[in-house]
Regions:
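Conserved, well-structured ligand/cofactor-binding cores
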Residues: 1-476
Length: 476
C-alpha cells in the first residue's frame, strides 16, 4: 500500500491526501471529523448522487455553460461511479454534520479527479475539472442531497414491494390450504369462538396487501424534487436553461416520473415526505411483528403450548436443552420491527428539528430510512423462504381444542339465551364435560338440533358462505 501523499488546500488550510486517492481534502476532513458509525454512504445513494451530477453536466453543457470536453469527462466519470467502480473512494460516514455537504463534496472530488485524469491531469490539480466550479455547477448540497435521497428511497422501496407481494401470495396459499382446519379463536388470550385457520391466514394476507398498497402510494411523496432550487429555493447561480431542463434530464436518466416542486422553498426546508415514507414502513413492520407473535403462540409447545401449527425447524434452539427448536424466523422479524420503530422515532425528531430555510439533519434521516427499508425487505424475504412456505397445521389437535372448549356455547345464545348458555359454559369448565354433553344431559336440545347449532364449520361461515350452505341444507 502506497504511503505517498499530495498536498491539497481548501478554505480551512492545507492537508496531505493519499496520492492515489480520487477523493480530496474535504472528504478527508469529513472522515476525520465524523468517525461516528463506521457505516459509509449507502451504495444506492452514491449511485443516485452520481446520476444527478451526470444530469447536471449534460444540462450545463446544453446550456453552453460547461465545455464539451469537460462535460464528456464528467459524464464518463459519473458512469464509472454509477457502475460501482470507485466505491472505495467514498469515505465519509453516513451520519455527518453539514446537511450532507461532506457527501456532496466527496462525490464532487471523486468525479473531478477522475474526469481530470481522463483529460490528462494528475489527481488533486483540479486544473481541468474543478469539484465546485464544474462538477457542482448550478447546484447546492441543499438540492442535490435531498433529491438523491428521494431517488434512493424509490430504488429501495421497489424490492420491498415485490417481497411483500410474494408474502401476500404465500399467505393466501396457506389460507386456502388451511380452509378446512377449524380451531378455537381467542380474544385477550382467552377462548372465544371457532375460527378456520384459513381465515386467520387470509386476515394476514389482507393486512400485508394493505401495507403493500400504502407503500405504493408513498412513492408519490418521492417524485417531487427541489433540484434547481440550490441553496434555499431561490435558484441562485442557476441559468434559466438549467432550471427548466435539469429535472427532465434527470427523469430521462432514472426513469422515474419526477417533477420540480412548485414551491422550492417548502421542498428545500421540509422533510415531511421522508417522515411519511418512514411511517408506512414502520406500520408494515409493526403489522408483520404482530403476525409473527401469533405464529410463535400458535406453534408453541410442542406438547405444553398451543401446538396448532408447526413452523419449519431451522436450527438448534438451545445449548443445554437437547432437541429444543425455537421460532427463530418470527423472532428476527419482530426484532427488525423494533429496530425500525426506533429509526422512525429518529427520523421524526430529525424532521422536527429543522430550522428556518434548511434541515441540517438529513444525513441521519437517510441513514435510518435506507436501513429501515432494506432490513424490512430482507426480513420479509427470510420470513417467506424460511417460515411461511413450510408451515403445517396440526389438524387433529385443532379439532380436539374445539370439542373440548366451552367457547362453542356462544352458538347456543340465539336458541336458549345468554344466561342459560353462560351456565352451560361455566359448568363445562368446572366439570370437564363438553358443551354438547351437558346440553343433551339436561334435555335442552336434541342431538339433531345440536348437529347444526354446534357445527364448528357453520359457526365460521360469513355472509354469502352462510347463505349458500343454508340453501344446500334446505335442498337436501
Amino acid at each position: 500500500m502506497t504511503t505517498e501523499t499530495r498536498l491539497e488546500a481548501d478554505s480551512i488550510g492545507t492537508m496531505e491526501v493519499p496520492a492515489e486517492a480520487y477523493y480530496g481534502v474535504q472528504a478527508l476532513r469529513a472522515k476525520q471529523n465524523f468517525p461516528i458509525t463506521g457505516t459509509k454512504l449507502h451504495p444506492v445513494f452514491i449511485r443516485n448522487l452520481a446520476q444527478i451530477k451526470k444530469a447536471a453536466a449534460i444540462t450545463n453543457n446544453n446550456a453552453g455553460l460547461l465545455p464539451e470536453d469537460k462535460a464528456d469527462a464528467i459524464v464518463r466519470a459519473c458512469d464509472e461511479v454509477i457502475a460501482g467502480k470507485l466505491a472505495e473512494e467514498f469515505i465519509v460516514d453516513a451520519i455527518q454534520g453539514g446537511a450532507g455537504t461532506s457527501a456532496n463534496m466527496n462525490m464532487n472530488e471523486v468525479i473531478a479527479n477522475r474526469a481530470g485524469e481522463i483529460l490528462g491531469c494528475p489527481k488533486g490539480s483540479y486544473k481541468m475539472v474543478h469539484p465546485n466550479d464544474h462538477v457542482n455547477m448550478a447546484q447546492s448540497t441543499n438540492d442535490v442531497i435531498p433529491t438523491a435521497g428521494k431517488l434512493t428511497v424509490l430504488d429501495l422501496l421497489a424490492p420491498l414491494e415485490k417481497a411483500l407481494a410474494r408474502l401476500e401470495k404465500e399467505l393466501a396459499k396457506k389460507a386456502e390450504q388451511f380452509d378446512d382446519v377449524i380451531t378455537m379463536g381467542r380474544t385477550q388470550l382467552q377462548d372465544a369462538v371457532p375460527i378456520r385457520l384459513g381465515q386467520v391466514f387470509h386476515g394476514y394476507a389482507s393486512m400485508v396487501s394493505r401495507d403493500r398498497k400504502r407503500i405504493e402510494k408513498a412513492h408519490r411523496e418521492m417524485y417531487t424534487v427541489n433540484l434547481g432550487g440550490t441553496a434555499v429555493g431561490t435558484a441562485i447561480n442557476v441559468s434559466d436553461s438549467y432550471f427548466y431542463k435539469i429535472v427532465p434530464n434527470l427523469e430521462k436518466l432514472t426513469g422515474y416520473p419526477l417533477k420540480q416542486a412548485e414551491d422550492l422553498f417548502d421542498a428545500t426546508e421540509n422533510l415531511d415526505g421522508f417522515v411519511a415514507v418512514s411511517g408506512v414502513v414502520k406500520t408494515c413492520a409493526v403489522d408483520l411483528s404482530k403476525m409473527c407473535n401469533d405464529l410463535r403462540l400458535m406453534s408453541s409447545g410442542p406438547k405444553t403450548g398451543f401446538g396448532e401449527i408447526n413452523l419449519p425447524a431451522k436450527q438448534n434452539g438451545s445449548s443445554i436443552m437437547p432437541g429444543k427448536v425455537n421460532p427463530v424466523i418470527p423472532e428476527v422479524v419482530s426484532q427488525v420491527a423494533f429496530h425500525i420503530v426506533g429509526h422512525d422515532t429518529t427520523i421524526t425528531m430529525a424532521a422536527e428539528a429543522r430550522q428556518l430555510e434548511l434541515n441540517a439533519f438529513e444525513p441521519v434521516v437517510f441513514c435510518n430510512l435506507f436501513e429501515s427499508i432494506t432490513t424490512l425487505e430482507k426480513a420479509v424475504d427470510t420470513l417467506i423462504v424460511n417460515c411461511i412456505t413450510g408451515i403445517t397445521a396440526n389438524r387433529k389437535h385443532c379439532k380436539d381444542l374445539i370439542e373440548s372448549s366451552a367457547g362453542i356455547a356462544t352458538a347456543l345464545c340465539p336458541h336458549i339465551g345468554y344466561k342459560a348458555s353462560a351456565t352451560i359454559a361455566k359448568t363445562a369448565v368446572k366439570t370437564g364435560k363438553s358443551v354438547r354433553e351437558l346440553v343433551l344431559e339436561q334435555g335442552i336440545m336434541t342431538e339433531k338440533e345440536l348437529e347444526e347449532v354446534l357445527d364448528p364449520y357453520l359457526m365460521t361461515e360469513v355472509g354469502e358462505e352462510r347463505k349458500e350452505d343454508e340453501a344446500r341444507r334446505k335442498a337436501c
